[in-house]
Amino acid sequence: MDSYNYRDFAVGGGLLQRIRLVVSGSLHCGESDATLNDPKHLPARCVFQFSGPDNNSVTFPIEYVLRLMKNWARSQCDPYIRIQNTGVSVLFQGFFFAPPNAPMASITSEHNNVILKSTHTTGLALSGIERVKRGGGLDLRPLQAMMQISCFTRMPVVQLSFRFMGPEDASRTQRLLERATSFGAMELHQKRTVDSCDRSNGIVSPREHRECRERQKRRPTPKRCASEVFASLASISSAFASERVKRRPVRIAAAILAFVFVAVILAIATKGRLF
């Protein structure tokens, strides 16, 4: 009998908790058919479900939920969300693998509306969302375009609108992506340097290997580099300011002397003309 692994259970509980946080509060979370105990052994049955009552309009972040499931898993999977009109409510069910004969919504970037009559079912997998993005020429980078489902429940019909929502501030998102890329490149360079030190352990002397490791430890992180740059700029600006303060009396005295000299010259010239 396998022992109870609290860490694995906590990881699965954390995934479900995050999904509950991003799903609309007007959707009721129901009991699932399977528990999440091991990200390496994924269940084939339903792992979560949400239902919405009649006369209700909600937004379901389908792509974000599917990517949460994909990132949590430690084995190959293609997460799938099934949407059903039960006749009294709309039901969202999550699977790590699409069930046999699972319906797939035939949507494109131009035709993104689906109407479900009573007891009818549709669904969409993460691979299907990526295919729609490529077909519509949308940006495939993270945070650029995320699919959401606008669900309008008016029994006996449920209307679904699959829409891509972009970031609120595209320039800020671009800066975040560039910053993450630059920091990732720096960390990769440092890791490669450390790995080269480790690989050279059997080639160079222990002293040289120790010095290589010490240099890597003393190397400042990108955050420290940025802070040092800002500190140096601040010190330079303060030095310039203090220098300007020191030179101010000298400049004032020089201006007064120049004014007196000009006045004397003008006075002498005026007297010469009078006489």
UniProtKB/Swiss-Prot annotation:
Keywords: Host membrane, Host nucleus, Late protein, Membrane, Phosphoprotein, Transmembrane, Transmembrane helix. It is a single-pass membrane protein. Phosphorylated. Residues 273-275 are nuclear. It comes from the Viruses. InterPro entries: Herpesvirus_viron_egress-type. It is found in: Host nucleus inner membrane. Residues 197-221 are annotated as: Disordered. The chain crosses the membrane at residues 252-272. GO terms for cellular component: host cell nuclear inner membrane; membrane. Residues 1-251 are perinuclear space. Belongs to the herpesviridae NEC2 protein family. Forms a heterohexameric complex with NEC1. Plays an essential role in virion nuclear egress, the first step of virion release from infected cell. Within the host nucleus, NEC1 interacts with the newly formed capsid through the vertexes and directs it to the inner nuclear membrane by associating with NEC2. Induces the budding of the capsid at the inner nuclear membrane as well as its envelopment into the perinuclear space. This is Nuclear egress protein 2. The lineage of its organism: Viruses, Duplodnaviria, Heunggongvirae, Peploviricota, Herviviricetes.
